[in-house]
C-alpha cells in the first residue's frame, strides 16, 4: 500500500519506542551541551514529545517512560558506565565511544538493570533500531554486542 506520492505509509512507532528515542536524544544533548536533567526533561516534554518543530512532527511518546530513562541514567550512571566499560573490547574506553552510541548504551543498560518487566530481546532490539536510525554499519552491531553482554551479566535469560 502506498500513498498518493508513491511513498509507503509511515508506521507509527509505539509510545515506549518513541520515549526511548527521545531519551537517547536528551542524554546526548546532556552529554554534549552540559544541560541538566531537569532542564532537558522540561524542554522535551514541553517542546518536543508529540510536537511539531520546523515542519517535523515528533512522535507521541510515553512521557513517564522518557522521564524514567533519563532520570534513571543520570541517577545510576556510576553503576551503568562500569558495566558498559566491561562489555566493550579491552582496548576501548567509554570516552572513545561516539556520544550518540554512549547515550544509546546508557539508556539500554538502564532498562536492562531496572525494567525487569521488559524482555531482554525487546530492549536490545529497540536500542539496535535506534542505532540504525543514526548509523549504517558498525555502531548498531556494537550496540547489539554490548547490550547482549550486559544482559547476560545482569539478567537471567527467559526460559523457553
From Swiss-Prot:
Matches recorded under SUPFAM superfamilies: NusB-like
GO biological-process terms attached to the record: DNA-templated transcription termination; transcription antitermination
Top-level taxon: Bacteria
InterPro entries given in the database record: NusB-like_sf, NusB_fam, NusB_RsmB_TIM44
Assigned keywords, A-Z: RNA-binding, Transcription, Transcription antitermination, Transcription regulation
One of the record's GO molecular function terms: RNA binding
Listed GO CC annotations: cytosol
Family assignment from sequence similarity: Belongs to the NusB family.
PANTHER family: ANTITERMINATION NUSB DOMAIN-CONTAINING PROTEIN (PTHR11078:SF3), N UTILIZATION SUBSTANCE PROTEIN B-RELATED (PTHR11078)
Role: Involved in transcription antitermination. Required for transcription of ribosomal RNA (rRNA) genes. Binds specifically to the boxA antiterminator sequence of the ribosomal RNA (rrn) operons.
Full protein name: Transcription antitermination protein NusB
Organism expressing this protein natively: Allorhizobium ampelinum (strain ATCC BAA-846 / DSM 112012 / S4) (Agrobacterium vitis (strain S4))
